[in-house]
C-alpha cells in the first residue's frame, strides 16, 4: 500500500489516495459505469463524473463515505458536483424484481406411481453424444402461485453422491470414487416467464430436456458422466425477466424417486422392459400393439413358421430343396410391372434360391444344384436342359400365377450336361407339343406371361401380344424379385434375349459370354458378384469347360441376316442376367423360333474381351407385334419383321460384318428372303434340325477335347 501524501504520525489510520485525480474517477467503481459491482447503488451518469478534489485533502475519504450514506438514504448528493436537477438515487427497494406478493407454491410430481416402479428397480437414463431425452419425463404440477405475478420455472440435474457405480449380479453397487463433475447447466422451461395462472393451468413438463456425455456439447444439453447417480431438481423463481435470475430467490424442490444412474446402454433388463411397456415411442419393440413392427410380425409369423420347418436342414448345415416357404405378402412386393420397385434387386442368397426351386425336386436336380455353386453358377439360372413337366403340371402352373415360373434348373455337371436322352425326347416331341398347344391357353391379352423353359411350346397365342424389348424398361419391374414362391412374370411387350433360355435345346453353352456380360452389366445387379467369374463367363458355365466356337463377326452377321437389328455392343448388357435368360427362354420355347435361336446362339460367342473392349450401345431388340394366333407355318421373326421391320431398321440396324460362306452353310442360317411370310413349317423344322445337328457336333467336339477352355 502506498504511503499517504501527508504523513502524520498521530493519525490512527492511513487513508487510501489515488495517485492522480484523473486516473481512477469514482464513477469507475460505482454503478454509473459498472452497475454489477453495486447493484443497490445507482447514481445518475453525471453525478460522479468529476474526479475527487485534491488528493492532499484528508477529508476525501470522508466525502466518499458521506456520498455512500446519502445514497443509502436516497437523498440528493449535491456536494459531489453539478448534476441535472431531476437526478436522484434509487433506493435498494426499487431494484427488487417486483413488489412483494404473497404466495406459497406447492409442487407435486406427475406419474409418481411410474417413477416409483422405476425407483424400486434402480432407474437408468441413457446418455448419448447427440443427446437423449429422459423417460419417464420430469413433469410436475404447481399450485399456490400468485395468479398475476410472473414466474420462471427451471430444473437442473446434480450429482446425488460422489460414487461411481457398476451393475453386478443384477444389482447396482459402488465401484469407486466419482469422476470429476461436469459443468452445471440449468434447463429453463421454454414458456418462462409466465404468470402463475398459466403455470397452474396444466402440468409443467420438461420432456425436451436432453442428457449427453459430450463434454464439448454446444446445444445446451445437460452433461453427465456415465455410471454415476444423479438427482433432478425443480426450481421456481419469481421474476418477470430471465436476466434477473442471478439476483432472484430460488425455491427448490427435490423428489427422491426421480434419481437415476446415467448409462450409455441399459444394464437392467427389467428397466428396459418397463420402458418398452410404458413409453409410447417404444411401441415398435412390443409384441402386441398397433405399431408397424407388430403388424409386420403378425403377418410374417405363419410364413416364418413354414420357413423354419422347410429350411431347418439347411440351417443345420444340410442342403434342403424344399420350396414351399412362401414369403409374407407384406415383405415381398407383388410382381406387377407398374408398382414394384427396381428390377435390379435380383441378387439372392442361397436360401432364397432354394425357395424358388421346384417343389418336387428330382434326384438329378438335387445333385446339379449342389454342383452349381462349386462351378460358380446360379442353380436357378443355368443353361442345361431341365427335366420336362407333364402336361397337367404345365396347365396347372399356367393357370396359377402364384406358383410362378420356376427358374431354369441346373444343366448337369458341365455346360453341356449329361442329358442326351432327355434332349432326344424333347426333339422328338417338340413339333407335336407345339401343334397341340398352339391353340391352347387363350387368356386375356394383358395377362402376365408365365415362362416355362422346360416345355417345347408352353406359350399359347394369347400370351404373346407383343414380344420385344420396350424402350421404357426403367421405372417398371420387368421381373419381380426372384424370392421364395414368387412367380417370374413377363409383362407383355417387354422381352429380352439371353442364354438360360435355350436349355430345352441344350444351347445354353453357346451364350456363356453373353451371360457373363448380362450378369455384370446390371449396374450393380446380381452379376456383379458372379457374372464375370472365370474370365467373363456367366453363371451358365464355368471357364474350364466352356468353348466359344463362333467368332465375333459370325454372331453379328447371324443377327443381322435374320432381320434382327443388332446395335453394336458397349461394354456389358444393361439388364441383369435374368432379363436376358428368361426372355430368351420364352423365345426358344416356341416351335418356329429357330432363326432367333440361331441368332442368339451365335451371339453367345462373344468373348470377354469384346464386351470389355468396345464402347458401343447395347444389344436390344426393337418392339414388334405377334398375331393373336400363331399358326404352325408362321415364324416368330417373320411376323416381327412384317410389323416393325422399318422401325427396327431405322433405329437400331447396323451393317453386318463379313462372313465366310462356309460358316453360313455350316450353321444353316437362312437369308432374308427365306423369312418371307410364306415360309412353311417344313422350312422352320429343317432350320431347327440343322441347329440341333450343329449342337450335337459341338457336344461331340467337347467330348473329344474336354480340357479346352474358351478363348480369353
UniProtKB/Swiss-Prot annotation:
GO cellular component: cytoplasm; nucleus; transcription regulator complex
Comp. bias (Basic and acidic residues): 349-371, 390-408, 420-443
Residues bearing PTM Phosphoserine: 336, 342, 359, 622, 653, 657, 676
Subcellular location as annotated: Nucleus
Function: Transcription factor which acts as a transcriptional repressor. May also function as a transcriptional activator. Binds to the palindromic T site 5'-TTCACACCTAGGTGTGAA-3' DNA sequence, or a half-site, which are present in the regulatory region of several genes. Required for cardiac atrioventricular canal formation. May cooperate with NKX2.5 to negatively modulate expression of NPPA/ANF in the atrioventricular canal. May play a role as a positive regulator of TGFB2 expression, perhaps acting in concert with GATA4 in the developing outflow tract myocardium.
Highest taxon of source: Eukaryota
Encoding gene (name): TBX2
Protein name, entry field: T-box transcription factor TBX2
Species of provenance: Canis lupus familiaris
Region (Repression domain 1 (RD1)): 517-601
Annotated region (Disordered), positions in chain: 313-449, 642-661, 666-688
Cross-referenced InterPro entries: p53-like_TF_DNA-bd_sf, T-box_DNA-bd, T-box_sf, TBX2/3_TAD, TBX2_3_RD, TF_Brachyury, TF_T-box, TF_T-box_CS
DNA-binding stretch(es), residue numbering of this chain: 109-287
Amino acid at each position: 500500500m502506498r504511503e499517504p501524501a501527508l504523513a502524520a504520525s498521530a493519525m490512527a489510520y492511513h487513508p487510501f489516495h489515488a495517485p492522480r485525480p484523473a486516473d481512477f474517477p469514482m464513477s469507475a467503481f460505482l454503478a454509473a459505469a459498472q452497475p454489477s459491482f453495486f447493484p443497490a447503488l445507482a447514481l445518475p451518469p453525471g453525478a460522479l463524473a468529476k474526479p475527487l478534489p485534491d488528493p492532499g485533502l484528508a477529508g476525501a475519504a470522508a466525502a466518499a463515505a458521506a456520498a455512500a450514506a446519502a445514497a443509502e438514504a436516497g437523498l440528493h448528493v449535491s456536494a459531489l458536483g453539478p448534476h441535472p436537477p431531476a437526478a436522484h438515487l434509487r433506493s435498494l427497494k426499487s431494484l427488487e424484481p417486483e413488489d412483494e406478493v404473497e404466495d406459497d407454491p406447492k409442487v407435486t410430481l406427475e406419474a409418481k406411481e411410474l417413477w416409483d416402479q422405476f425407483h424400486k428397480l434402480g432407474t437408468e437414463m441413457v446418455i448419448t453424444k447427440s443427446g437423449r431425452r429422459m423417460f419417464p419425463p420430469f413433469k410436475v404440477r404447481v399450485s399456490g402461485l400468485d395468479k398475476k405475478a410472473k414466474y420462471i420455472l427451471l430444473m437442473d440435474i446434480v450429482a446425488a453422491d460422489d460414487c461411481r457405480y457398476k451393475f453386478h449380479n443384477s444389482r447396482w453397487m459402488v465401484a469407486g470414487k466419482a469422476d470429476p463433475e461436469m459443468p452445471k447447466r440449468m434447463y429453463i422451461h421454454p414458456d418462462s416467464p409466465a404468470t402463475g395462472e398459466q403455470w397452474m393451468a396444466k402440468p409443467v413438463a420438461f420432456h425436451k430436456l436432453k442428457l449427453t456425455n459430450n463434454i464439448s456439447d454446444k446445444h445446451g444439453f445437460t452433461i453427465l458422466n456415465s455410471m454415476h447417480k444423479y438427482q433432478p431438481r425443480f426450481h421456481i423463481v419469481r421474476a418477470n425477466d430471465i436476466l434477473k435470475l442471478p439476483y432472484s430467490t430460488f425455491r427448490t424442490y427435490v423428489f427422491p424417486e426421480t434419481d437415476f444412474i446415467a448409462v450409455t446402454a441399459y444394464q437392467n433388463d427389467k428397466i428396459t422392459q418397463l420402458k418398452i411397456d410404458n413409453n409410447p415411442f417404444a411401441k415398435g419393440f412390443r409384441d402386441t400393439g398397433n405399431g408397424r413392427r407388430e403388424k409386420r410380425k403378425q403377418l410374417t409369423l405363419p410364413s416364418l413358421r413354414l420357413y423354419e420347418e422347410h429350411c431347418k436342414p439347411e440351417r443345420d448345415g444340410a442342403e434342403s430343396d424344399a420350396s414351399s416357404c412362401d414369403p409374407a405378402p407384406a415383405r415381398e412386393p407383388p410382381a406387377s410391372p407398374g408398382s414394384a420397385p427396381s428390377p435390379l434387386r435380383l441378387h439372392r442368397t442361397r436360401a432364397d434360391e432354394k425357395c424358388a426351386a421346384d417343389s418336387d425336386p428330382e434326384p438329378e436336380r438335387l445333385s446339379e444344384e449342389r454342383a452349381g455353386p462349386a462351378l460358380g453358377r446360379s442353380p436357378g439360372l443355368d443353361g442345361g436342359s431341365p427335366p420336362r413337366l407333364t402336361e397337367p403340371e404345365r396347365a396347372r402352373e399356367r393357370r396359377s400365377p402364384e406358383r410362378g415360373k420356376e427358374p431354369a434348373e441346373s444343366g448337369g455337371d458341365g455346360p453341356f450336361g449329361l442329358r442326351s436322352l432327355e434332349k432326344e425326347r424333347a426333339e422328338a416331341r417338340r413339333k407335336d407339343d407345339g401343334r397341340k398347344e398352339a391353340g391352347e391357353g387363350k387368356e386375356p391379352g394383358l395377362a402376365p406371361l408365365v415362362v416355362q423353359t422346360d416345355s417345347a411350346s408352353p406359350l399359347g397365342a394369347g400370351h404373346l401380344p407383343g414380344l420385344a424389348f420396350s424402350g421404357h424398361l426403367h421405372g417398371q419391374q420387368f421381373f419381380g424379385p426372384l424370392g421364395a414362391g414368387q412367380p417370374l412374370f413377363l409383362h407383355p411387350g417387354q422381352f429380352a434375349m439371353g442364354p438360360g433360355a435355350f436349355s430345352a435345346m441344350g444351347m445354353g453353352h453357346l451364350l456363356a459370354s453373353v451371360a457373363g456380360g448380362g450378369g455384370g452389366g446390371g449396374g450393380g445387379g446380381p452379376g456383379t458378384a458372379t457374372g464375370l467369374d472365370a474370365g467373363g463367363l456367366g453363371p451358365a458355365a464355368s471357364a474350364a469347360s466352356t468353348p466359344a466356337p463362333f467368332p465375333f463377326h459370325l454372331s453379328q452377321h447371324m443377327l443381322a441376316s435374320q432381320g434382327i437389328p443388332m446395335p453394336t455392343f458397349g461394354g456389358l448388357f444393361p439388364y441383369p442376367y435374368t432379363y436376358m435368360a428368361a426372355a430368351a427362354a420364352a423365345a426358344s420355347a416356341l416351335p418356329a423360333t429357330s432363326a432367333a435361336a440361331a441368332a442368339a446362339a451365335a451371339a453367345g460367342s462373344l468373348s470377354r474381351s469384346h464386351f470389355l473392349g468396345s464402347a458401343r450401345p447395347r444389344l436390344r431388340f426393337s418392339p414388334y407385334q405377334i398375331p393373336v394366333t400363331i399358326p404352325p407355318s408362321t415364324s416368330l421373326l417373320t411376323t416381327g419383321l412384317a410389323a416393325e421391320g422399318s422401325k427396327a431398321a431405322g433405329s437400331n440396324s447396323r451393317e453386318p460384318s463379313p462372313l465366310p460362306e462356309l460358316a453360313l452353310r455350316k450353321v444353316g442360317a437362312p437369308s432374308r428372303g427365306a423369312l418371307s411370310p410364306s415360309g412353311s413349317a417344313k422350312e422352320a423344322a429343317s432350320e431347327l434340325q440343322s441347329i440341333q445337328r450343329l449342337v450335337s457336333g459341338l457336344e461331340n467336339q467337347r467330348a473329344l477335347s474336354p480340357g479346352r477352355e474358351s478363348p480369353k
